[in-house]
Swiss-Prot record:
Gene3D superfamilies: Nucleic acid-binding proteins. Residues 1-32 are annotated as: Disordered. The gene is rpsL. Belongs to the universal ribosomal protein uS12 family. One of its GO terms (cellular component) is small ribosomal subunit. It comes from the Bacteria. Disulfide bonds: none annotated. The modification 3-methylthioaspartic acid is found at residue 89. This is Small ribosomal subunit protein uS12. With S4 and S5 plays an important role in translational accuracy. Interacts with and stabilizes bases of the 16S rRNA that are involved in tRNA selection in the A site and with the mRNA backbone. Located at the interface of the 30S and 50S subunits, it traverses the body of the 30S subunit contacting proteins on the other side and probably holding the rRNA structure together. The combined cluster of proteins S8, S12 and S17 appears to hold together the shoulder and platform of the 30S subunit. PROSITE patterns: RIBOSOMAL_S12.
């Protein structure tokens, strides 16, 4: 513990928190254009083909974004909405594509957690 004299001389340092989504530039979401849509494999204990897209954002930064849900209609030059949120088993993927916004369709035949996947209520 510092003495009062040390605190008078130096003072307390405030912790600087690291920005987890720098490419969004403080926005909740950003629009972007898909430059490449592909699949990749997750880290060690898991095994799958995760769908991801390389997206050039309106802030002129290119990021890798995860495409959530079962099936998608994205291809090169699709306009997408990107939000923050990392995928734990994909290194370097710190953004997600918003389903049901802009060119991205919602997940078909989805009954639960529909708002997360842009699925409309079935009549």
């Amino acid at each position: 513990m510092p003495t009062i004299q040390q605190l008078v001389r130096k003072g307390r340092k405030t912790k600087v928190s690291k920005n987890k989504t720098p490419a969004l530039k403080g926005s909740p979401q950003r629009r972007g254009v898909c430059t490449r849509v592909y699949t990749t494999t997750p880290k060690k204990p898991n095994s799958a083909l995760r769908k991801v897209a390389r997206v050039r954002l309106s802030s002129q930064i290119e990021v890798t974004a995860y495409i959530p849900g079962v099936g998608h209609n994205l291809q090169e030059h699709s306009i997408v909405l990107v939000r923050g949120g990392r995928v734990k088993d994909l290194p370097g993927v710190r953004y997600r594509i918003v389903r049901g916004a802009l060119d991205t369709q919602g997940v078909r035949n989805r009954k639960q957690a529909r708002s997360r996947y842009g699925a409309k209520k079935e009549k």
